[in-house]
A protein has these predicted regions:
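Beta-propeller blade signature
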Residues: 58-66, 126-136
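Short, low-complexity, Pro/Ser/Thr/Gly-rich segments in the mature regions of secreted, periplasmic
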Residues: 136-160
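A short, polar/proline- and glycine-enriched secondary-structure boundary/capping micro-motif
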Residues: 84-86, 122-123, 149-156
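Acidic, glycine-rich flexible loop segments
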Residues: 85-127, 132-133
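Short beta-strand segments
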Residues: 71-75, 124-128, 139-141
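Short, solvent-exposed coil/turn segments at beta-strand boundaries
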Residues: 28-31, 66-70, 104-110, 133-136
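A mature extracytoplasmic/lumenal domain signature
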Residues: 38, 66, 78, 113-117, ...
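Surface-exposed acidic loop/strand-edge motifs in secreted or periplasmic proteins
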Residues: 2-96
Length: 160
């Protein structure tokens, strides 16, 4: 379930798939480069799902590079950065799944993040928004536009 390097991992543990992403974004009058890298981290506590499967959690590095090549922002995120939004019990069975650039919004860069079930077949996650200001400040909030854990039935508009 992940890219295995020369380092051998126990067969009973699962790695979440690695990814590296790079995007250009027009922000505050210039073109910035956003780099996002996700890796399993064997140093973080193991996740055990309801079926007893064990997973390594992820660390995601988010970097924003100025047009001149200098680094404006660089931070490693782990699930603990989002703990106040997901609850202690949910955190024990969830992983940091991903961070993606959403948009430049005035003086801020907005990123969608998700913490959820590490099984690739699951759609259980908590959506979050990371905002980075032009001064490098970071804020995190739950994304109220989506509710993946809703108990409400899905309704479709007919004739639309």
């Amino acid at each position: 379930l992940g890219y295995l390097s020369e380092k051998k991992y126990p067969e009973s543990f699962r790695l979440v798939r690695y990814y590296d992403e790079e995007d250009a974004v027009s922000w505050i009058g210039s073109s910035y480069n956003v780099k996002i890298s996700r890796r399993s981290d064997t140093g973080l506590p193991l996740i055990v799902d309801d079926s007893g499967n064990k997973y390594y959690d992820n660390v995601i590095t988010l970097s924003v590079v100025r047009p001149d090549g200098s680094e404006f922002f660089n931070r490693k995120f782990t699930k603990s950065d989002f703990s106040s939004y997901i609850g202690e019990e949910y955190a024990k069975k969830s992983a940091l799944l991903g961070i993606v650039l959403e948009k430049a919004d005035g003086d801020n860069l907005k990123f969608a993040a998700s913490v959820g079930a590490p099984d690739v077949l699951s759609d259980d996650y908590v959506p979050l928004i990371i905002t980075i200001s032009r001064t490098g400040g970071v804020s995190i909030q739950k994304d109220s536009r989506i509710d993946s854990n809703s108990d409400q039935p899905d309704y479709e508009d007919e004739g639309v």
